[in-house]
Design a protein with these regions (language model features):
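Flexible, gly/ser-rich surface segments that form the specificity/activation loops bordering the active-site cleft
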Residues: 32, 118-173, 181-185, 201-214
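Conserved active-site neighborhood of the chymotrypsin/trypsin-like protease fold
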Residues: 42-46, 51-53, 63-147, 171-174, ...
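Catalytic nucleophile loop of clan PA
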Residues: 57-58, 180-204
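Conserved hydrophobic positions within beta-strands
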Residues: 56-58, 95-97, 162
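Short Gly/Pro-enriched turn/cap motifs at secondary-structure boundaries
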Residues: 35, 47-48, 97-99, 152, ...
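Short, solvent-exposed mixed-charge patches
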Residues: 309-311
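Protease-domain processing segments flanking chymotrypsin-fold serine proteases, especially trypsin-like
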Residues: 3-55, 59-60, 292
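C-terminal cap/linker of serine protease catalytic domains
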Residues: 32-37, 141-142, 201-302, 306
Length: 311
């Protein structure tokens, strides 16, 4: 297979031949860390089901159907999943349409909406170099470190740097970075300094339960439970090029925005606020999830009217 600028030849073309759009601007705007966070906020979704909690990124749209890239382990069990978008609206996922990519921890799920949501720009992940600054966006699950036990969720946006790459990818995971992450952020996007998705987060080092038990005087059960919530070491992402190369094998043909230009230096460093932004906060997740049923009921009523009064 031939490669052009690090992208496999099958991916370089038009929406007619490959259903993938390659955008190669000559100049990439330098953004501040806060501007990258604004982009991350709009493209990051929460994915939740009765037995699972994770994140994802909106990568494409076709009519009223949106496509979300996430880690497969977030949606590995057949269940009733919902997506929560940046405006805190929930939508049901049709699990029968979930696409798993072969040999890696990636999946594409879809939801339907009349609303306009921002679509992520992707970037040739061969541009990722050791030492480059990256950001991770995602929704930590209830009970994660720093989350309110009463049902409040806060989207996390953390900065760090690429520290290296695994010689032998594990489930597709290859990119290593220093960003702090928490359970529930799996499937969330890793962004470069231009706000483009360069990878999908999904694996991280965790605290050793025996060391935690000895240090804190905890019971073995408590130590094991808490250890899973603490990620003191490096974290790992599947590079976006892995998705681009494998998508056709899973029947995933989407109009994607893929750029091939290097990331610029950050215009201004990201500094987290003392308090969470209200746009990144869900006070009552159950109330938000109930909005999915209202959306379905509204769509059903519209379809009944159309069948009765065709126009």
């Amino acid at each position: 297979m031939k490669f052009y600028g690090g992208l496999p030849a099958i991916l370089v073309g038009t929406a007619i031949t490959s259903a993938i759009v390659i955008v190669q601007p000559s100049v990439v705007m330098a953004l501040s860390g806060e501007q990258v966070n604004d982009i991350a906020r709009e493209i990051t979704v929460l994915i939740t089901g009765p037995n699972s909690f994770g994140s994802g990124a909106i990568i494409a749209k076709d009519g009223k159907t949106y496509y979300v890239l996430t880690a497969h382990h977030v949606v590995s069990r057949k269940d009733d999943y919902k997506v929560v978008t940046s405006d805190k609206q929930a939508y049901k996922i049709d699990y029968s349409k979930m696409k798993r990519l072969p040999g890696v921890d990636l999946a594409v799920v879809e939801f339907t909406s009349d609303k306009d949501y921002k679509i992520a720009k992707l970037v040739n992940s061969d541009q990722a170099k050791q030492g480059k600054e990256v950001f991770v966006s995602g929704w930590p699950s209830l009970g994660s470190v720093g989350q309110d036990a009463g049902g409040q969720l806060i989207r996390q946006f953390t900065n760090g740097r690429i520290s290296g790459f695994l010689e032998q990818p594990l489930g597709g995971y290859k990119m290593i970075y220093t960003n702090v992450t928490r359970p529930g952020m799996s499937g969330g996007p890793v962004l470069d300094t231009a706000g483009r998705v360069i990878g999908i987060h999904g694996m991280g080092d965790t605290e050793d339960p025996e060391r935690l038990r000895a240090r804190e005087g905890l019971t073995p059960e408590a130590a094991r439970s808490i250890a899973g919530l603490i990620k003191p070491g490096f974290n790992y992402a599947i590079p976006i090029n892995t998705f681009l190369q494998l998508a056709p094998q899973s029947g995933v043909y989407l109009a994607l925005q893929v750029e091939n230009s290097p990331a610029p230096e950050l215009g201004a460093a990201y500094v987290a606020g003392a308090k969470p932004d209200s746009r990144d906060q869900i006070d009552d997740i159950n109330s938000v999830l109930n909005t999915a049923d209202r959306v379905v009921n509204t769509i059903d009523r519209i379809e009944r009217v159309r069948r009765r009064f065709p126009f």
